[in-house]
């Protein structure tokens, strides 16, 4: 705590001053002006009457936070089989339900946006990311939910919505070494198979890790791959 020169604002009783990335709380005490640095958590608590409660978190939540874009969380999904609905893989079959193995996945939700990536190995902050071998996911890993709305849905509900939604012919390229033009052709060949061929995963270019992707999205640190809207 320190004494500083009186404020130029004669009527000021207290003030919160932004000093770089820190917060300086300043108040009058008699004829002097006192000040001290306070943490962002203290500022948040002072301006919010509502307690922060994540609610019950699903298993494999790796990280949670909040920022300018809203609440965010990172979920890891181990390798497993999924039953997914695909549209128009072939001209004569409008829809097809496939029981397929998928690699380990990272699902991230931030504000109203959701992202998904694949992993070759176990989850780790420094693990390199690969394109999720699924349609309806753009080059940054952002998921297109079509007309489905995410507002009011929990992280688990958003993940389940992604699995339950039909996968279309949109954004099917660049996600498989064996089938670079349409990853659905690879997925159809994996129906009832036990394991996903990890060698077929397409790495993100340039290479980026889980931690770098999360930092780019949550701290507004764009890089050559992940762009912050």
Stretches with model-predicted labels:
Residues 4-10, 14-150:
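Compact alpha/beta protein-protein interaction domains typified by the UBC
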Residues 2-9, 125-229:
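Domain-scale recognition of soluble eukaryotic interaction modules
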């Amino acid at each position: 705590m320190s004494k500083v020169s009186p404020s130029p604002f004669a009527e000021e009783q207290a003030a919160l001053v932004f000093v770089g990335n820190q917060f300086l709380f300043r108040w009058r005490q008699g004829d002097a002006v006192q000040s001290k640095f306070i943490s962002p958590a203290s500022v948040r608590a002072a301006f919010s009457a509502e307690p922060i409660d994540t609610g019950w978190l699903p298993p494999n939540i790796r990280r949670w936070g909040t920022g300018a874009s809203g609440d965010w969380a990172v979920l890891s999904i181990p390798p497993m089989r999924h039953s997914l609905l695909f549209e128009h893989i072939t001209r004569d079959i409008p829809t097809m339900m496939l029981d397929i193995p998928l690699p380990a996945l990272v699902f991230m939700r931030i504000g109203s946006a959701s992202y998904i990536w694949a992993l070759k190995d176990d989850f780790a902050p420094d693990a390199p990311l690969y394109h999720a071998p699924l349609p309806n996911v753009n080059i940054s890993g952002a998921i297109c939910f079509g007309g489905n709305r995410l507002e009011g849905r929990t992280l688990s509900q958003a993940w389940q919505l992604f699995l339950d939604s039909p996968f279309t012919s949109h954004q099917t390229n660049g996600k498989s070494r064996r089938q670079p033009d349409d990853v659905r052709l690879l997925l159809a060949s994996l129906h009832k198979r036990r394991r996903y061929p990890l060698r077929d995963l397409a790495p993100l270019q340039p290479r980026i890790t889980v931690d770098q992707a999360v930092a780019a999205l949550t701290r507004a640190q764009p890089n050559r791959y992940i762009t912050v809207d």
